[in-house]
């Protein structure tokens, strides 16, 4: 059952986010307007048709968060209906009792939590030895912590991309397994079996080689990478590690709290954070706010006129009305993101963040291998070597799991 569930989760993540990436790329391109701009110059048939780009990334994030919360709610409702509801109210369905009150785990003491955690670890084989745990935070505090991490991670990633090349960003993201592993050990004092460190090292090196030796890297590299951009990339990786390790801590400390309940809470929190930013007028140049502060804060900033842009929600709705061709990719982007999140949180709950990150960082590799078979694309020798290193890491993991299963079978 565990192998089948993992296979379904991996297939769901790959399929949903492969199509999601296509929708995301389409949303980054211009859309033709049904109302042509005045004084617009005619274009030749060889030129791409003129258009406008989607005005607000915040609106896109809000749409995906809304779709994620609805997807989680539908999943939880269907699961409760299949189980006959059993007297479940909305609070129990969404896990609100665990979030805002004493959870059953807390009421029954640490003994029951430790027993459930050891059973979970026996299934995933990620944690093989219980370590002394730091004082348990409330579930609400941990969820707020994850929400803050998720909210600031994306803007920092976009800011880093302004100062480094895209291949450098992809290469850095391929090393995401390292901060997830280290922060689980350092922050929450988890102990992993020695082979886990070998697997993480092999997969990270293999994925890095696959990205580094790609032929497109040289073509796309273009500019140089600044030190500031590399610092932002490291901060982004650190935040990713904090997010995933804290999610592991939540499922370890609160076994009755499910992945889809966390997904709903995270998506709802994101909507609450983004809503004021969408409906309120924001300064067109936030740095200009410093000019209006009293000395010494505003003394070194040139005086500038403070202007505000229209609310992003109104701009986005107006854009969709005048550019109806953007509706389909926006709907696909939000829906596929919501469906993909279902598989992501299912993977975290049952197999841990290390397995999830291993799935996500190898997604591009397996997509490229599929393109080699289907479209006869070619890989460089360095990329094939990277593929071999990744499969060596996967082989080590599979071999150790088989060894554990055989040991358990002999005991029984």
From Swiss-Prot:
It is found in: Endoplasmic reticulum membrane. The chain crosses the membrane at residues 3-23, 58-78, 139-159, 197-217, 222-242, 262-282, 325-345, 355-375, 379-399. One of its GO terms (cellular component) is Golgi membrane. It comes from the Eukaryota. The gene is HUT1-A. This is UDP-galactose transporter homolog 1. The keyword Glycoprotein applies. GO terms for biological process: UDP-galactose transmembrane transport. Its main location: endoplasmic reticulum. It is a multi-pass membrane protein. GO terms for molecular function: UDP-galactose transmembrane transporter activity; UDP-glucose transmembrane transporter activity. There are two genes coding for HUT1 in strain JEC21, due to a translocation and segmental duplication on chromosomes 8 and 12. The keyword Transmembrane applies. Belongs to the nucleotide-sugar transporter family. SLC35B subfamily. Glycans are attached at residue 244. Keywords: Endoplasmic reticulum, Glycoprotein, Membrane, Sugar transport, Transmembrane, Transmembrane helix, Transport.
């Amino acid at each position: 059952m565990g192998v089948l569930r993992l296979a379904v989760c991996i297939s769901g993540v790959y399929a949903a986010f492969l199509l999601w990436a296509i929708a995301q790329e389409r949303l980054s391109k211009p859309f033709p307007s049904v109302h042509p701009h005045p004084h617009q110059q005619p274009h030749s048939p060889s030129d791409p048709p003129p258009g406008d780009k989607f005005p607000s990334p915040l609106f896109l994030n809000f749409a995906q968060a809304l779709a994620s919360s609805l997807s989680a709610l539908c999943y939880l409702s269907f699961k409760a209906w299949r189980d006959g509801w059993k007297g479940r109210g909305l609070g129990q369905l969404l896990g609100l009792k665990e979030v805002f009150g004493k959870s059953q785990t807390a009421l029954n003491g640490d003994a029951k939590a430790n027993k459930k955690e050891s059973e979970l670890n026996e299934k995933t084989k990620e944690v093989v030895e219980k370590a002394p745990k730091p004082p348990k935070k409330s579930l609400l505090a941990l969820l707020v912590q994850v929400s803050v991490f998720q909210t600031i991670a994306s803007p920092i990633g976009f800011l880093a991309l302004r100062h480094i090349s895209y291949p450098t960003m992809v290469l850095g993201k391929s090393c995401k397994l390292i901060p997830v592993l280290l922060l689980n050990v350092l922050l929450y004092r988890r102990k992993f079996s020695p082979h886990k460190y070998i697997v993480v090292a092999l997969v990270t090196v293999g994925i890095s080689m696959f990205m580094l030796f790609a032929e497109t890297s040289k073509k796309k590299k273009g500019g140089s990478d600044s030190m500031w951009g590399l610092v932002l990339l490291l901060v982004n990786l650190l935040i990713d590690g904090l997010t995933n390790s804290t999610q592991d801590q939540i499922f370890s400390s609160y076994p009755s709290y499910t992945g889809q309940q966390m997904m709903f809470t995270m998506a709802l929190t994101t909507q609450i954070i983004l809503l004021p930013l969408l409906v309120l007028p924001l300064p067109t140049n936030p740095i200009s706010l410093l000019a209006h502060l009293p000395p010494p804060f505003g003394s070194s900033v040139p005086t500038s006129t403070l202007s505000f842009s229209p609310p992003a929600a109104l701009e986005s709705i107006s854009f969709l009305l005048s550019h109806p061709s953007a509706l389909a990719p926006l709907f696909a982007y939000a829906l596929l993101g919501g469906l993909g999140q279902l598989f992501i949180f299912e993977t975290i709950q049952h197999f841990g963040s290390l397995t999830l990150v291993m799935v996500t960082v190898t997604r591009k590799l397996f997509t490229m291998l599929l393109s080699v078979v289907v479209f006869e694309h070619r890989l460089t020798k360095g990329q094939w070597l990277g593929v071999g290193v990744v499969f060596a890491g996967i082989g080590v993991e599979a071999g150790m799991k088989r060894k554990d299963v055989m040991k358990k079978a002999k005991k029984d």
